[in-house]
């Protein structure tokens, strides 16, 4: 059940409880000495003896219930039976302590054989991250939280959710993906329920696409069998082979064939791509020149252009895949190009994350080090907020 140093830690904790379980075979000074005339035969002491025995039995029940609650695989049948029916009389305060102890332990250790107990779905934290840590992406802030939360709160979704993030490098695609992972799963990217694939790293050679398909299908199936809520992230999605993306088709069809339905009720596919980021920039620049404010730009201004351009792009497998052609992607989410003011905010956040003091002049210096385009307007940072941390190190050296 408990192994290594954990056993000593929990035994020490249990000693603090009234009537903590004693080692087997340990004798008590008052047992076997109740002959007439003995001090142990005093009626008051006998009542105390009975109360101590009852307290000891209760502590053993605490321990048995807690261990079976946290380590169900290691819980022996006789231990489960010893807990008695659910209605056994556990004092209210003791139940609260037990719940607190279980919650505390499960906050940093696995408590069940599946990864489900590590799913947090912290939508409040996700909302805070999107609104406070992400800059210049009002469309992402509006759409991602609403879409993901709505999907995960649907009792029986008809299909997996597919979101495709598009935009220039450094605009926040990977940043938002990490926010999702960290707020939906306690273990983040280390969660058994999350898988991340980088196209050029995991699937580098087109000639092995059939082998990659088998491997991908196997990993998806194993992850779904382990967790009822899974997340699969595909970085550099524009470099994925169209045949490889076919594997995902059955999960994204609204009425998938019976043999191809997702084994986990909730599955999210997240695609990250720089594909057609230039189109997003062109549309945004045109709207800004026409007098629109950045915050007035809507999905209707961008998504139709973005989707059409992705389909027409010749040199990428993602646009030619069945997922795009048959509209199996739920949302193409544009990440807008970042301006000078957004770069300053990224620099400020980088200082704060390292608990470093900064001056407003320093933020300006860092922002001015970035290259801005187009050549005439000098409006958008060509690298977004990428390399901000490295530039801060320059000021600290």
Swiss-Prot record:
May not form homohexamers. It is found in: Cytoplasm; Endoplasmic reticulum lumen. GO terms for cellular component: endoplasmic reticulum; endoplasmic reticulum lumen; extracellular exosome; nuclear envelope. ATP binds at residues 167-174. Residues 1-25 form the signal peptide. It comes from Homo sapiens. Its main location: cytoplasm. N-glycosylated. PANTHER family: TORSIN (PTHR10760), TORSIN-3A (PTHR10760:SF3). SUPFAM superfamilies: P-loop containing nucleoside triphosphate hydrolases. GO terms for molecular function: ATP binding; ATP hydrolysis activity. Keywords: ATP-binding, Cytoplasm, Endoplasmic reticulum, Glycoprotein, Nucleotide-binding, Signal. This is Torsin-3A. Ubiquitously expressed. Highest expression in stomach, salivary glands and lymph nodes. Isoform 2 is expressed in placenta.
């Amino acid at each position: 059940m408990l192994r290594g140093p954990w056993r000593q830690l929990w035994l020490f904790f249990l000693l603090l409880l009234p009537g903590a379980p004693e080692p087997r075979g340990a004798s008590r000074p008052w047992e076997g000495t109740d002959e007439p005339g003995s001090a142990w035969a005093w009626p008051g002491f006998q009542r105390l003896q009975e109360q101590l025995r009852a307290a000891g039995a209760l502590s053993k029940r605490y321990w048995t219930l807690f261990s079976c609650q946290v380590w169900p695989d290691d819980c022996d049948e006789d231990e489960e039976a010893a807990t008695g029916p659910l209605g056994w009389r556990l004092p209210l305060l003791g139940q609260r302590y037990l719940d607190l102890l279980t919650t505390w332990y499960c906050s940093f250790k696995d408590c069940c054989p599946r990864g489900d107990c590590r799913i947090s779905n912290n939508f409040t934290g996700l909302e805070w991250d999107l609104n406070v840590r992400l800059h210049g992406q009002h469309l992402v802030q509006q759409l991602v939280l609403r879409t993901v939360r709505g999907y995960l709160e649907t009792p029986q979704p008809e299909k997996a959710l597919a979101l495709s993030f598009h935009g220039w490098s450094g605009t926040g695609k990977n940043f938002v993906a990490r926010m999702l992972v960290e707020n939906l799963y306690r273990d983040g990217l280390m969660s058994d329920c999350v898988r991340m694939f980088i196209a050029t790293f995991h699937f580098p050679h087109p000639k092995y696409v059939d082998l990659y398909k088998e491997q991908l299908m196997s990993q998806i199936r194993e992850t779904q069998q382990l967790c009822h809520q899974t997340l699969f992230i595909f970085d550099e999605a524009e470099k994925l082979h169209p045949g490889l993306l076919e594997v995902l088709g059955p999960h994204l069809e609204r009425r998938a064939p019976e043999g191809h339905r997702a084994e986990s009720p909730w599955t999210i596919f997240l695609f990250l791509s720089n594909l057609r980021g230039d189109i997003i920039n062109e549309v945004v620049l045109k709207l800004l020149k026409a007098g629109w404010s950045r915050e007035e730009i809507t999905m209707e201004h961008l998504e139709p252009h973005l989707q059409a351009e992705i389909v027409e792009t010749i040199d990428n497998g993602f646009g030619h895949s069945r997922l795009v052609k048959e509209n199996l992607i739920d949302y193409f989410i544009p990440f807008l190009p970042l301006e000078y003011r957004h770069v300053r905010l990224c620099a400020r956040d980088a200082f704060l994350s390292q608990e470093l003091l900064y001056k407003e002049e320093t933020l300006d210096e860092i922002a001015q080090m970035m290259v801005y385009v187009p050549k005439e307007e000098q409006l958008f940072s060509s690298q977004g907020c990428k390399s901000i941390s490295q530039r801060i190190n320059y000021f600290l050296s």
